[in-house]
Regions:
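Compositionally biased, low-complexity repeat tracts
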Residues: 3, 68, 76-79, 128, ...
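Acidic, glycine-rich flexible loop segments
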Residues: 130-173
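Gram-negative bacterial Sec-dependent N-terminal signal peptides
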Residues: 1-25
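Extracellular/luminal beta-rich ligand-recognition
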Residues: 104, 108-137
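A generic short-segment signal for beta-strand/edge and adjacent turn/coil regions
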Residues: 3-7, 38-45, 55-59, 123-129, ...
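N-terminal small/polar-rich segments of proteins
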Residues: 24-117, 161-164, 169-204
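Alpha-helix boundary/interfacial micro-motifs
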Residues: 15, 21, 132-133, 197
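A broadly tuned preference for mixed-charge, low-complexity surface segments
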Residues: 25-31, 90-95, 128-146
Length: 204
């Protein structure tokens, strides 16, 4: 009888110990590293200088099944051209593809200016003083600024989105892409044009 009781006590102890092991507290930790590509450039002499003011990072929003959009501000500096009667500033996309080495999937970055899509084929006009178009870049388009001999600056902003994706050369939805990171350059070309009668630059 004593042996039976002892066996019961031992069994109960083992069971209790098992439950105690399952209930042990634990700590789980995750870390992520963010990387910024860094380059320092100073240019205060060129006729046109455009400087992006932030980098672009798109994150997939699982609930929306799409990537978030980014507002990318940029600084524009021009060297006024004395004698100019009109000034025009236009832009178009040069490169906008993100890719990765783990597979052949690609993402296309769309660029919008005041809601209008920029393209690779046609210039999007930002400023045209002959038509009174300034697109909010009033400081550059002001009479006595673009046609002066001084430098002037203003700030604009593009909206960047992940417009579409492809895999194996065919269009695919974002949800079908495997997890990972895509990298690449988004390049927008700006062209500034002054029309007027200019004094020839002195010979060096």
């Amino acid at each position: 009888m004593l042996n039976k009781k002892l066996g019961t006590v031992l069994l109960s102890t083992v069971i209790a110990a098992s439950f105690a092991t399952v209930a042990n507290a634990e700590t789980r930790t995750a870390q992520a590293t963010a990387t910024w590509q860094a380059t320092a450039i100073k240019d205060t002499t060129s006729m046109l200088v455009v400087t992006p003011l932030k980098s672009l990072t798109f994150n997939y929003a699982e609930g929306q099944k799409s990537f978030n959009q980014q507002n990318g501000a940029f600084d524009i500096a021009i060297q006024g051209q004395s004698g100019a009667t009109d000034f025009k500033l236009a832009s178009k996309i040069i490169a906008n593809t993100l890719a990765r080495t783990t597979d052949d999937s690609k993402l296309t970055v769309g660029v919008k200016w005041n809601g209008e899509d920029l393209t690779k084929d046609t210039d999007t006009v930002l400023i045209d003083t002959s038509k009174g178009l300034t697109s909010g870049l009033d400081n550059l388009a002001a009479d006595g600024v673009y046609n002066s001999s001084d430098r002037a600056t203003d700030r604009g902003e593009f909206t960047f989105v992940i417009a579409n994706a492809e895999s194996a050369g065919a269009a695919t939805d974002f949800n079908s892409l495997t997890d990972g990171t895509w990298d690449g350059d988004v390049k927008v070309q700006f062209t500034a044009t002054w029309d007027g009668t200019f004094t020839p630059a002195p010979a060096p």
